[in-house]
């Protein structure tokens, strides 16, 4: 399975309210997504939010990410999060990871939001 772990560092209280709006809509989309194996949400503080999802394939994951409410959320990401402290990491695994493992992998990643395809979406 393909696992995706996203850390979202919320900018401020307005960003948190925006996150709640987009997260609700994205979660509704996620529940209907084909190829989703498992999902989880975690917060280490009011401004440090985490999502973890496992997918049958990259194609299934991209179908969710690049459409509907999730795409709208990505286009509005700069109004929600600190783009220099938010990141996503993906890897293949046989077992859905623990939060400790997911956070460790995310923290060890050299991913830079500002150089990602997501940054282009939020500038459109």
Named regions from a protein language model:
Residues 1-48, 62-63, 84-124:
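Short S/T/G/P-rich N-terminal loop/turn motif that feeds into the first structured element of a domain
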Residues 58-87:
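An amphipathic, aromatic/His-enriched active-site/gating alpha helix that lines ligand/cofactor pockets
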